[in-house]
């Protein structure tokens, strides 16, 4: 059995994290919740639900992911999903399948290909994602449909990508670098539902604009970099 670690960045998600952890299927051999500076009981709830909790005081989605990766050095495959219950953790089996069957190095769960519940994402967030994906496809020659956080990658591929982005450009950096370095990338449909609690990013137009600007900059920088 392959060693599969699930990394879940979390910031003030005490209402959702217990449900997320409860829904993770047994294919995961280790689950790590990265507390990214929560001021609520996220860490306590996660521990009570059976997860290992590590702390990353430096704010940022990418920073939390990097801390989670460092915490699972023995993992052969690392999966990422959100802590807000917007993803369906049970679909981890489908996300992992192309890697486990030897057909992919990186699998991205595409919300565009799956079923999106009403009010799962505000319109400005959907349009912003389409803009970012469109730019990536144009500059890199990919045929992606999403930059969603629910994904899985082999440890070897992840090491080769030398991930650096500290914030929300993390997923875009991974996909651009994977494409430029010739990794086998596949998308699988994943469903999406309204998150529990308020969003720290896409809940406001300003938040989405800030995140979107960072993602666009990440795409352009890595797409035009000689090193990839």
Q: Where on the chain are the PLM-derived regions?
A:
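N-proximal low-complexity "stem/linker" segments adjacent to membrane-targeting elements
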Residues: 1-23
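Acidic helix N-cap motif at the loop->helix transition within catalytic regions
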Residues: 15-19, 40-49
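A conserved acidic beta->alpha catalytic loop
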Residues: 35-43, 85
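Catalytic donor-sugar/metal-binding loop of nucleotide-sugar-dependent glycosyltransferases
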Residues: 142, 164-166, 176-193
